[in-house]
Amino acid sequence: MSKYDSHLKCSFCGKSQEQVRKLIAGPGVYICDECVDLCNEILDEELLDTNGAAAQPTPRAEPPQKRRTQSSSISFNQIPKPREIKKYLDEHVIGQDEAKKVLSVAVYNHYKRLAVIQSKATGKAAADDAVELQKSNILLIGPTGCGKTLLAQTLAKILDVPFAVADATTLTEAGYVGEDVENILLRLLQVADLDIEEAQRGIIYIDEIDKIARKSENPSITRDVSGEGVQQALLKMLEGTIANVPPQGGRKHPYQDCIQIDTSNILFVCGGAFVGLEKVVDQRVGKKAIGFVQPGEGQTKEKRAADTLRHLAPDDLVKFGMIPEFIGRVPMVAVVDPLDEEALMAILTQPRSALVKQYQKLLKMDNVQLDFKPDALRAIAQEAYRRKTGARALRGIVEELMLDVMYELPSRKDVTRCTVTREMVEKRSTAELIIHPSSLPKPESA
């Protein structure tokens, strides 16, 4: 077959030789490398136990505590209680008690719902038990860097169910450039090692959900493919439906067979900053000053906004740009508080994987003890608060401070201790280094 025979094309997809990487010839037919890959994928999917008859694929190696719970039965007595879930969250996330309680109760009820479904499937449920437990999806509202995503990531470490995180900013309505909403389920399926039954009892966290608000309160004549269109596409998934999930994402491989996933028992947690939502609430509540005293005087702007959001009503979210049908499918709303200076101080030192502990461990591997003076921690928290990006600013500041230290110390065998001072934070000066006595030059004898 000549490399330059432009009339040759794939007998399956019709693409010419110039459009594919490889064209394989057969007796009077040709097949391209893309169609070969597609055939392999279809054969691999036949191995999935979609109907309970085929063999399961070999699971990935996982830590013992995770492997123990995969595909295992759920006993009501083994379900973690809300207090236990919150206690674990307290070890990793500072503050946000209301959001922790909402998540703890929601996850606990999610487990109970799965236990009831399992008892009905095994015939252990009472014959007259006709009550069906419906899920209550969650909406987390709060400024950037206050712990919404960290709460979701921390939950993923303790759950006995698959947990996936998705970003709403990449989603578009079907038929337009971007990701389909079914790709969210694909992430959950991948976390569950392509185990469909396991994925159908999982939890999905959708971040930046406020970015799909429609551009105006009134329905637009033109299509809003990344806003209202995405909200419409998410409705059935949030409520519960049989979704067709393409194993490779759909857009680049349109001819693949889809995997069907029932979303009825998948719990959805949505989070977003919703910048400007407090102004919508203010307009509805109609806060007015009497005399010269302003409401919330003496509070920071962020604290006033958080207090205002305590009076949030569904109509406020509609005015912000969320459609009523979407709001009805996320009935539980929790407001995440902004982080003040004291909270940022606590984040530096108190959590199990606190930032200071991380850098202390890094330097300990070089046999150097790292210390932060209290006034240095205060200066770091103050600078992070001024940056207005929440806890995310802390890592950037500490990374700037420790760059030169972490560059030099691996080559310095004479240093035993490094101390970060307030002056170092404010002026970006050099850290205080303590030299091992044996490395000091010995005084000359007379």
Swiss-Prot record:
| HAMAP family referenced in this protein's UniProt entry, alphabetically | ClpX (MF_00175)
Which residues are Zn(2+)-binding?
A: 10, 13, 32, 35
Describe the subunit structure: Component of the ClpX-ClpP complex. Forms a hexameric ring that, in the presence of ATP, binds to fourteen ClpP subunits assembled into a disk-like structure with a central cavity, resembling the structure of eukaryotic proteasomes.
| Claim: ATP-binding is one of the keywords in the record | yes
Q: Where is this region: Disordered?
A: 54-76
Task: Return the protein name.
Answer: ATP-dependent Clp protease ATP-binding subunit ClpX
Record's keyword annotation contains Repressor? no
